[in-house]
Amino acid sequence: MANSTTVTEFILLGLSDACELQVLIFLGFLLTYFLILLGNFLIIFITLVDRRLYTPMYYFLRNFAMLEIWFTSVIFPKMLTNIITGHKTISLLGCFLQAFLYFFLGTTEFFLLAVMSFDRYVAICNPLRYATIMSKRVCVQLVFCSWMSGLLLIIVPSSIVFQQPFCGPNIINHFFCDNFPLMELICADTSLVEFLGFVIANFSLLGTLAVTATCYGHILYTILHIPSAKERKKAFSTCSSHIIVVSLFYGSCIFMYVRSGKNGQGEDHNKVVALLNTVVTPTLNPFIYTLRNKQVKQVFREHVSKFQKFSQT
């Protein structure tokens, strides 16, 4: 279908129309974005500078931190600009690009979370072969496959949406270009792209969740059969942070996207739930992974101590 689009820009309504709340919302999101960048860059820095953290687990964590930075940077800068300037518009191309990157990076995160759960499964359930199975080459291949899977799954439905005609209203009741609000503005039959979106959401979300759940089922079974209480606690502590992240991220996304149809989605509810996987979860992730990880905390304290000694000389 030829693109007979007449709309050149969209209006993002954001979270609230109340003028008195705009400054508060802006400051809140600005602080949140700063914390996300600080926390994830800190993870990247720590896992790069200390050779003790040159392990598959921290290699995957570093890649996940990079993904989180890009994922949130797709939304936050434009959202903050719209709030502070009062101009809530986004160009047609900008909206398509934002939607594509949001789903591409988000889908890649699902696959990377599944890879991280498999890494923990091998480490706990098959520790003697861990170094052999999770070699550097395998780790690089798993990360590459995660990126390629996200790209290949999203590029087809995104290109179909891009070719659709937008000739009617241009108001999106959201704070970014999400899939369902965008499809409501298409002036043509959207059954094909809806079906593709539903299938891809089920495959990427529920498929990777099945892998993650299976891995952690085996992990919990193995942990419960460890005779030493101290070793059980140590083994569980390496996985608990990942379980928390998975629960938050998957829970919000399944609520939003694993449903067929674009009608009756409850836009206001979707905006609130979208805050979980675009704002709350990325903010909590660095703190969950660092505050619950003794090795990361130890390395961080050592580097802070070195910096303090260096600054005092």
UniProtKB/Swiss-Prot annotation:
Superkingdom of the organism of origin: Eukaryota
Subcellular location: Cell membrane
UniProt GO molecular function: G protein-coupled receptor activity; isoprenoid binding; olfactory receptor activity
InterPro entries documented for this protein: GPCR_Rhodpsn, GPCR_Rhodpsn_7TM, Olfact_rcpt, Olfact_rcpt_6C-like
GO cellular component, one term: membrane
Membrane spanning residue stretches: 25-45, 64-84, 96-116, 142-162, 192-212, 238-258, 271-291
GO process terms (BP): G protein-coupled receptor signaling pathway; sensory perception of smell
Family of the protein in this entry: Belongs to the G-protein coupled receptor 1 family.
Principal place of residence: membrane
Disulfide bonds: C95-C177
SUPFAM superfamilies named in the record: Family A G protein-coupled receptor-like
Glycan-carrying positions: N3
Protein name: Olfactory receptor 6E1
Record Pfam families: 7tm_4
Protein purpose: Odorant receptor. Activated by (-)-citronellal and to a lesser extent by (+)-citronellal. Not activated by carvone or limonene.
Lipid bilayer topology: Multi-pass membrane protein
